[in-house]
Amino acid sequence: MEPNSQRTKVPAFLSDLGKATLRGIRKCPRCGTFNGTRGLSCKNKTCGTIFRYGARKQPSIEAVKIITGSDLQVYSVRQRDRGPDYRCFVELGVSETAIQTVDGTIITQLSSGRCYVPSCLKAATQGIVENQCQHIKLAVTCQAEATPLTLKSSVLNALQAAPETKQSLWQLATEPTGPLVQRVTKNIMVVKCKASQKHNLGYLHASFMQKISSRSLPERRFFCSCQTLRPHKSSVPKAEAAPKCIHFFACLCAFASDETLAQEFSDFLNFDASGLKEIIVPHLGCHAESSVSACESAASKPRKRKKDEVSGAQVNSSLMPQDAVNSNLRKSGLKRPVVTSSLKRHVCGQLLDEAQVTLSFQDWLASVTERIHQTMHYQFDGKPEPLVFHIPQSFFDALQQRISIGSAKKRLPNSTTAFVRKDALPLGTFSKYTWHITNILQVKQILDTPEMPLEITRSFIQNRDGTYELFKCPKVEVENIAESYGRIEKQPVLRPLELKTFLKVGNTSPDQKEPTPFIIEWIPDILPQSKIGELRIKFEYGHHRNGHVADYQDPRPPMDQPLELAPLTTITFP
């Protein structure tokens, strides 16, 4: 009776329309809600999938400055003739040119640039283009800066990949040449890489695209500049798809390190076919084990065709931080697995075993190296107070072993002094052993650790108020461009203002007679029952300005200047 009653409600002039079709509507690939084909986003508010951007979409950013951590000025510039997703690199700098005049020689600074688009490089070498190309002009007027993405070491350590891959990622992330991953546009990232003939600056572009089709699941596309672009119509089976490069995993680790990015790029983190099964982001909190049990229970259930994406998000929920997983579960309407109270008590009430809390010698030595780095500041005079450490005897034995590396026997101290301490604690008679190191390479060999290599020089920039700020200097060796671009190499070297401090060890100037020592002093048994001794490190450092030794200048104003106070006035009340 009900179907007949519904048919009677149809007006007579619509009775001959025929069978209903799906013309003009389409299903949302994520939640299955029917939407109009002209719709920009899903009308299901809990879904919010964006189908396409409207006509008022903001244009792609023309030029973005890359954070290099040095004086090197690198820009990511859009190639207008190729589309919004094609970008290139431009390097800007300042070069000094001497001009001979009647009055003498005038040294002027000229802004110059180098565009790394092959066509622009070729045109510059052949002398076809006299003025700057359009990419350099865009870089000169650039005011936008890339957004650095944080990479958590816990995420990188949890990456179930080859040790070589993790080691390469860690080396790139710890190099003082800016962040590992930077966001240039919504879909394009700039990733650090090893400098090569193809990537001279040590950076490349990586893009994450998502093409949504009305008849199938979203198609996720990743392209990296280190890969060769396949023909558009070539069909490559999923089983034969090329493995993802190291830059792809670098971006995913950066996405998983931030909750907002993990939600935005959850499709890439959750996608099984892209080879992300091996990436696991560690969870923090009491419900870490419950999330694992949820994954196992979801994986044990058979997957249905209509719930492919829901089950996929459930299986790979370990790819995202816990909050992101919870938000996805709320959106999809799934119930969280029940966690028994005994499990909660076991996870939350787990006590820290004090016997397992240890500090290795290399971790301690890395802290010493970091103290030396902090002390070598351009704003101070280069003669710091001794660095004092209280360490066990075993740590100093390991340090003394490093001091003796290269010699057949244990190196004896340069001097041994016995002294009586009466004016300060602890009181008593102590022995002090002193080593003088006059070779900078030996100092670096003693203090180098995998986590914290010793930096012999440190770079700084001067602020407007006269203070100085640390500016990490790059160590990227840019290989020569092809021989066909030989004329570019003959351009003057770009040398911006350089402010550096350097460790004074040995003879640092031609007229120096006595070498400057790096002094290590050891006083054992300051705490005799605990076997703790006192280690003192004394050193000096100098200042460089544009490659020349500069005298220290105190940026602070002198305190002996009299203050000028306005005269007081007498106010009379009527």
From Swiss-Prot:
InterPro entries: C2orf42, Zf-tcix. One of its GO terms (cellular component) is nucleoplasm. It comes from the Eukaryota. It holds the Pfam family zf-tcix. Residues 297-317 are annotated as: Disordered. This is Uncharacterized protein C2orf42 homolog. The lineage of its organism: Eukaryota, Metazoa, Chordata, Craniata, Vertebrata.
